[in-house]
């Protein structure tokens, strides 16, 4: 993606506001004309508005125009409010989280009919909450595109955003997890640092402060099936995002370079989604999917029940803890997808070393698919701020982090100096990059 030209880069003859206005006008036209030319719906706040603005196969220049439009809109907003109004607008952000939490708790998303309006009075009776309080919270939420009020002032209906949360269980779990877990963790980050400083222990985190537990996040969630189910649905929603779609893994590497009958080991591969996507595209490769026993059992049963024999026969499910030495030796490829960002450097090095012990020099390759943080200002702020929010979430959850390229290089070298980073690829539209690593001869 080309770097975004901020207001400071627009030249001295044009004011920042005028320059950004031109960027917005230009890129709005590109996006709108593409949608019109391809008979696609224009973005709309109405309940029947499209969930996705651009299809995943939209041309690169159109995708970039959308990102430039978002970034310029964010920057012109900041310039227009000025420093004097920064704090009042900042306060709206946590109030939106508060509204979302309240609306989810009282099941407002599902009590508002999908295809018609409902009066505030009837909705208040259905929920057992005071009508005036319901109005106050809904009307605040409406200023961030959640729900829409009928012009009569007495009825409320869905917007495009609230309709999505009402109809998509995974997206709804994303919202409730954000409110019940991510937001409290974020607000506990300072207290965690005051208590434990630069600790990288997984049970000395903002999560531990927020929820008063001595257990690491995953161990704590595992104590409660409902919470673990919410987390699983939340992760399903995250992984369904276009930016982390499996197609980027499938197309982002020259998998044809693996010889016929070669083996790829998906370390921490959950129930096999990534390996199955690769198996469907590359019939010459065999796969071993490794994860904790309950995950591989679930994946193995699902694969046997739903996959054609020519794919299922190339999948092997194996219970394995990646904090222990890798049992599959001399495989052609090992894959760590969305794994290492959950772990502080010390544990991440251990995970890598456990794989290195199984790699065959010059033959085996290790592929890490994870976030590579951009250099500040090198991508549109709309992209950068989401990446940096993920980085903070990793700190707050696990005392881990998203890594810059130099940090990845240091991590790889610390695991074994023989490991050589031979390629870094970020597929178009992917939030993650693929690091290709080989074990050199001694």
From Swiss-Prot:
The record's note on what follows loss of this gene reads: Abolished completely the production of the naphthoquinones derived pigments and leads to the accumulation of four new compounds which lack the O-methyl group, including 6-O-demethyl-5-deoxyanhydrofusarubin and 6-O-demethyl-5-deoxyfusarubin.
User: What is the enzyme's main class?
Assistant: transferase
* Pathway given in the UniProt record: Pigment biosynthesis; Secondary metabolite biosynthesis
PROSITE patterns in the record, alphabetically? SAM_OMT_II
Q: Identify the catalytic residues.
A: 341 (proton acceptor)
Q: Which positions does UniProt annotate for S-adenosyl-L-methionine binding?
A: 291
Task: Extract the InterPro entries matched here.
Answer: COMT-like, O_MeTrfase_dom, SAM-dependent_MTases_sf, WH-like_DNA-bd_sf, WH_DNA-bd_sf
**Endoplasmic reticulum found in the keyword field:** no
Extract the Pfam families matched here: Methyltransf_2 (PF00891)
Q: Which UniProt keywords apply?
A: Methyltransferase, S-adenosyl-L-methionine, Transferase
Q: MF terms per GO, please?
A: O-methyltransferase activity
Q: What does this protein do?
A: O-methyltransferase; part of the gene cluster that mediates the biosynthesis of pleosporalin A, ascomycone A, as well as a third cryptic naphthoquinone derived pigment, all responsible for the coloration of conidia. The pathway begins with the biosynthesis of the cyclized heptaketide 3-acetonyl-1,6,8-trihydroxy-2-naphthaldehyde by the NR-PKS pgmA.
Name the protein family: Belongs to the class I-like SAM-binding methyltransferase superfamily. Cation-independent O-methyltransferase family.
Name of this chain's protein: O-methyltransferase pgmB
Species of origin reads Aspergillus terreus
**Which lineage do the record's taxonomy fields give for this organism?**
Eukaryota, Fungi, Dikarya, Ascomycota, Pezizomycotina
Q: What gene is this protein translated from?
A: pgmB
